[in-house]
Regions:
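DUTPase catalytic domain/fold
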Residues: 1-175
Length: 175
């Protein structure tokens, strides 16, 4: 059975997420009115996408970093889009670099470069990372959400359930 995923534009210039047959996730694109958006070093900004969605209640969307954003120091933060959420998707991106990241529209790059050194003066002349507005900023996986029953146990009862790891913590597997 094929599940239908529904997307809608919340802004006219938004791009509906795209996916090739062999890709796991849908590419999600930025959508903002300004010519560019700056993400200062070591800060997180929610990037608007101009899209909303709906899907069956037994699915959700999970946002993940793309390799093209990760190599630029753009870390995609948490991102679960529940089946019942109908608002615009916002993608939290953290700049892990010591210089600003500028998501810039193609037609604005020439103008942007003219005043970039003034705008970004504290970080040094023309010392920034340019990310094209036309590229996807994350990918969205459609994952099943199983319906489960919860059973309550005392902590002692829970620890008594067989487990290879038990209560051992980080690094305990030796892998």
């Amino acid at each position: 059975m094929i599940t239908t995923v529904k997307f809608a534009k919340t802004k006219p210039n938004a791009i509906i997420p795209t996916k090739r047959l062999e890709d796991a996730g849908y590419d999600v694109y930025p959508c903002f009115d300004e010519d560019y958006m700056i993400i200062k070093p070591h800060t997180t900004v929610i990037i608007p996408t101009g899209i909303a969605s709906a899907c069956d209640t037994d699915y959700c969307f999970v946002l993940h970093e793309r390799s093209s954003t990760g190599t630029k120091g753009m870390a995609q933060r948490c991102g679960i889009i529940d089946s019942g959420y109908r608002g615009e998707w916002g993608v939290p991106i953290t700049n892990t670099n010591d210089v600003p990241i500028v998501i810039c529209k193609k037609e604005s790059i020439t103008d942007f470069n003219d005043f970039a050194s003034i705008l970004l003066f504290p970080y040094g002349e023309a010392n920034y990372i340019l990310y094209p507005y036309e590229k996807a900023i994350c990918q969205a996986l459609v994952l099943p959400v199983p319906e489960v029953e919860i059973e309550k146990y005392t902590y002692e009862e829970l620890k008594a359930i067989l487990s290879e790891r038990g209560t051992d913590r980080l690094g305990s597997s030796g892998k």
